[in-house]
């Protein structure tokens, strides 16, 4: 502010000087602000989005790999390679024969006519030709109940998910039982998605289906692969005493990896409690579980899992290779060789498991109607006695 008692000339001089100084200060501050803003933008501005080409390039060997001659040693996922190039060769242990044969096509035709939804086809199971390829009375099919939408989202599974799936069809137990009784199979597996939206997790629906199958065709052996019912042991009891022959519930993986592999609502100990309760509810039941290998588990972790299973009296265990359904799912850490699967089969049998199926392409319902299990079940029904177990 210019003092009022100064002469007009001096006031004018001071006024112009003040304005020039103010402009200089503003200019200096503006430049400093611009420089600071530019520096901050440079620090926080994200890099240009990588192109598909860059992503693909980064998956392969680096420049140093080519210089050192190690480019040929860079691992390429055989399943990913096969998806991109149909001519790419898979390891021999991941190859399966093309489904064919009179029995296979007969079972497939029956599935269509009876309007049954089988996991065998929908999940593109690699063992379908084995399970459907023999005599119809020896064939095994896995029927999906309670819809095709799960309320959980495990990182290995490609089944559709939703918090509010469609309500169960009240006629499904009757229709399924009627269809299966007319089919002529000797062994059937019923499975289901997790239904956390239902008060009992769908236990009553499954139990009613089993009861009606046994009513219409008592000779059919029934296995149910169920969920954990959120740990509700009452729901477990409902299913265990429904008349089924094999109660299956999958652990999927070892305890340390469970939080990373399965939905957060599924816990290792909760699954063990379900298998244990099923045996307590009906001691004559065969209890069964399945483990996938290839998530990065260690031998000691697998051994501890087998000890835990034997500790609760689990009778049957299967081992199979985890295969990534899509790029949105967990990566495969290791493709386990067939020799390792043979090793775990021997270990499990020595620990006292009644039956073990182990191989890269084995799934939880693989050859569920194996003659050995059928014989054990039929002997129990006639009170001939249980098959001996190894100590």
Curated annotation (Swiss-Prot):
Q: Which residues form the signal peptide?
A: none
Q: Where in the cell is it found?
A: Mitochondrion
Transit peptide from where to where?
1-44
Q: Which residues bind [4Fe-4S] cluster 1?
A: 120, 125, 131, 365
UniProt cofactor(s): [4Fe-4S] cluster
Predominant subcellular localization, coarse grouping: mitochondrion
GO MF annotations, alphabetized: 4 iron, 4 sulfur cluster binding; lipoate synthase activity; metal ion binding
Record GO cellular component, one term: mitochondrion
Which InterPro entries does the annotation name? Aldolase_TIM, Elp3/MiaA/NifB-like_rSAM, LIAS_N, Lipoyl_synth, rSAM
Does this UniProt record's set of keywords contain Mitochondrion? Answer: yes
Q: Record-annotated residues binding [4Fe-4S] cluster 2?
A: 150, 154, 157
One matching Pfam family is Radical_SAM
Keywords attached to this entry = 4Fe-4S, Iron, Iron-sulfur, Metal-binding, Mitochondrion, S-adenosyl-L-methionine, Transferase, Transit peptide
Regarding protein family, the annotation reads: Belongs to the radical SAM superfamily. Lipoyl synthase family.
Among PANTHER family, the record links this protein to:
LIPOYL SYNTHASE, LIPOYL SYNTHASE, MITOCHONDRIAL
This chain belongs to the protein called: Lipoyl synthase, mitochondrial
């Amino acid at each position: 502010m210019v003092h009022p008692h100064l002469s007009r000339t001096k006031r004018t001089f001071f006024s112009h000087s003040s304005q020039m100084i103010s402009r200089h200060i503003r200019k200096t501050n503006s430049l400093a602000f611009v420089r600071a803003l530019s520096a901050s933008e440079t620090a926080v501005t994200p890099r240009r989005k990588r192109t598909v080409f860059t992503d693909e390039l980064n998956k392969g060997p680096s420049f140093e790999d080519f210089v050192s001659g190690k480019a040929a040693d860079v691992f390429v996922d055989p399943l990913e390679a096969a998806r991109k190039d149909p001519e790419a060769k898979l390891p021999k242990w991941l190859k399966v024969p093309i489904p064919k044969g009179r029995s296979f096509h007969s079972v497939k035709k029956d599935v269509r006519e009876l309007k049954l939804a089988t996991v065998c086809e929908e999940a593109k199971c690699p063992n379908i030709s084995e399970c459907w390829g023999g005599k119809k009375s020896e064939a095994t099919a896995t029927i999906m109940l309670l819809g095709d939408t799960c309320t959980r989202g495990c990182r290995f599974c490609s089944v559709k998910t939703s918090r509010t799936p469609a309500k169960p069809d009240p006629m499904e137990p009757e229709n399924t039982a009627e269809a299966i009784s007319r089919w002529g199979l000797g062994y059937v597996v019923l499975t289901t998605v997790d239904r956390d939206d239902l008060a009992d997790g769908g236990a009553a629906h499954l139990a009613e289906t089993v009861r009606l199958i046994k009513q219409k065709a008592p000779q059919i052996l029934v296995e149910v692969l169920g969920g954990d019912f959120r740990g509700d042991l009452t729901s477990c009891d409902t299913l265990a005493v429904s008349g089924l022959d094999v109660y299956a519930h999958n652990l999927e993986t070892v305890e340390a990896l469970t939080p990373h592999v399965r939905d957060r609502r599924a816990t290792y100990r909760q699954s063990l409690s379900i298998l244990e309760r099923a045996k307590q509810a009906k001691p004559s039941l065969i209890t069964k579980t399945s483990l996938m290998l290839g998530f990065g588990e260690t031998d000691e972790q697998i051994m501890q899992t087998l000890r835990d299973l034997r500790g609760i009296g689990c009778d049957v265990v299967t081992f199979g290779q985890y295969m990534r359904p899509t790029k949105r799912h967990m990566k495969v850490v290791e493709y386990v060789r067939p020799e390792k699967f043979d090793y775990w089969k021997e270990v499990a049998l020595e620990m006292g498991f009644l039956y073990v199926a182990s191989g890269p392409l084995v799934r939880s319902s693989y050859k569920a109607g194996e003659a050995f299990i059928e014989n054990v079940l039929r002997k129990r029904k006639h009170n001939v006695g249980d098959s001996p177990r190894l100590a």
